[in-house]
UniProtKB/Swiss-Prot annotation:
Described function: Component of the MICOS complex, a large protein complex of the mitochondrial inner membrane that plays crucial roles in the maintenance of crista junctions, inner membrane architecture, and formation of contact sites to the outer membrane.
Coiled coil (UniProt feature): none
UniProt protein name: MICOS complex subunit MIC12
Keywords: Membrane, Mitochondrion, Mitochondrion inner membrane, Transmembrane, Transmembrane helix
Amino acid sequence: MSKIAKLGSFTLVSGVVATSCYYYFIDRDGYHYKRSVWKQVGDEVQRVIDRKPSLVFSKEKYGDQFDYDYKVSGERVERVPVDHKQLVLRYNSETMKDLWNKEVRALVDWVYSR
């Protein structure tokens, strides 16, 4: 009887995990995964590490009204829009500090909210 119970519980748990993974990652083209906070933070950190601009406009949200060229000089990254107004981004080190402070504040809020 215990072997049947173990097999049944293993089957139930693996079925629930597989179903959860399916609905989280595959169903609706990964809607929940792409919008999760951990993925957004991970993507932002990866952009900083790759020295890509941290200010990103999505075409689906803003359309084609933002067309930029990128100009890199040292650590400074500048975006030059089509109408030639300059939008200057901050240093990568400042962005890393802001990411660190954001995560520390979120952790402190979580610790003291309990």
